């Protein structure tokens, strides 16, 4: 399904349209998370706020593999536009939501569209450009993905503070409108597609299993206890339908996920790395702002700005990884990535309340640089040397596993951080006596340290104990995250000797 657009001057407008789509999709969840406090204060229903994120993520992840396969079968353009229109419709509706129930429903609509944007955009780049140019373009796209993920919290805080939470959603409308125009007007795709049978059995069993798993992970420990009937029931249904999915896929003529791809060593390792990187990178975006706000006493907006060095590092890493794809093996570039990521995480894990913010900036630059490589290299590795009719499936699998890793990482590491914080706080307070001890026992929610006005009224002895407990719990999580990074390092060694071959090299090989 190669497009001729790569030879057309209008290709630059297609690229802009795709970049805008990635910008919205990657930024959406983090930008909304920043505004959730204000949204709850306005709409009420605190007990339902977790569903705002859960409903969107479930819809996105359930759609990713389906869109990837359908784009292979019937073309990229129509499904990218379908996703874009649904995303814009959902965004506009979210902005006018009058209740939490409405917002949750509209987030589902937004998520149905969002699941198409990221995987199909990366796939179109491979269709548009020859091998020697794909690296540069995937580096650019990976940079925008990394930029969007880190920019979300900052932009969300600024919009919520200076305008209103509604514009966290409305901002997508003009961006998406430009993307829609550029893709409709300039993306010329071949209309020659074979009529193929849709794997409805695989689609249904996969969607049901993903929906159950995602709801269990998103709501467990928040809305329901992990041992509750609801969560156990969701995990049980997930297991049943996931097993059914495997059985159905083995017999399907055109399976949603082609498991034969995992026999390719480069493809298989790229999927494992996407999952591991997703699960570890996200904790930096989540916990560094918390560290800055709780330990350093910075404002929410300032905490958002603190991620800028990591953003710059990831952009640089993504661009370098993309540019050198045709010159070095995937394995060699990912070794640089995983070493940088490991060093950065190790340094972050050794921080204390006395660590200067300048050093935090350096540590984030190192971490972001390492992670940035993965944004451009892993999608490219997933689609390397694959026939064009399998690219959508390959890249959607990679995007799905990265997103799944992010969800799992936030859930697991978030639970660990909360438990460690509570344990250390209890131990710390138990040894306090006198007026400070009484103040500690009478204190309400320790999370009050996030609020500047309340923080100033907490006795210094109590405040210092809370800060130390918070710092220790977050750095404990960073040190624990070294485990999946080490697993990633071992996985990288099995990537083989492949690299992106230029057009001339492929012609010489076939000729």
Please tell me what each predicted stretch does.
Residues 11-64, 68, 144, 164, ...:
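Transmembrane core module of solute transporters
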Residues 39-40, 70-71, 155-163, 217, ...:
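Interfacial helix-cap and linker-helix signal at transmembrane-aqueous boundaries
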Residues 22, 84, 88-91, 106-107, ...:
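A generic transmembrane-helix signature of 12-TM secondary carrier transporters
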Residues 64-202, 219:
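Helix-loop-helix hairpins in multi-pass membrane proteins, especially solute transporters
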Residues 3-8, 180-207, 222, 250-265, ...:
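Flexible interhelical linker loops that connect adjacent transmembrane helices
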Residues 141, 151, 360-438, 493:
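Small-residue-rich alpha-helical segments with characteristic i,i+4
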Residues 174-191, 207-219, 237-251, 488-496:
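C-terminal membrane-cytosol helix-exit motif in multi-pass small-molecule transporters
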Residues 403-494, 502, 508-511:
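Hydrophobic transmembrane architecture of multi-pass small-molecule transporters
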